[in-house]
Amino acid sequence: MLSPKTTQITIYTTSWCGPCKSAKRFLADQGFDFTEIDIEKENISREEMASMTKGLSVPQIVINSKPIGGFEDLLEYFKKG
């Protein structure tokens, strides 16, 4: 079971990404803090992001140093507990 107090979450986003907004809202609604990295503002290429997350699309979510994937993957991850 994930604990909001001990779970480290990083979400790679862009400003125009609808699923990114949904993922951030979902995490906030669940009581989780997260670090957001806007790849456009931070000038991170998708290839650089993929080397850290294993994915080219946004959002890419990393929980406790483990790449989870996108928004649908996040929902599945929480469903499994």
Specify the residue positions occupied by each region the protein language model found:
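Non-catalytic, surface beta->alpha helical segment in thiol-disulfide oxidoreductase systems
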Residues: 63-81
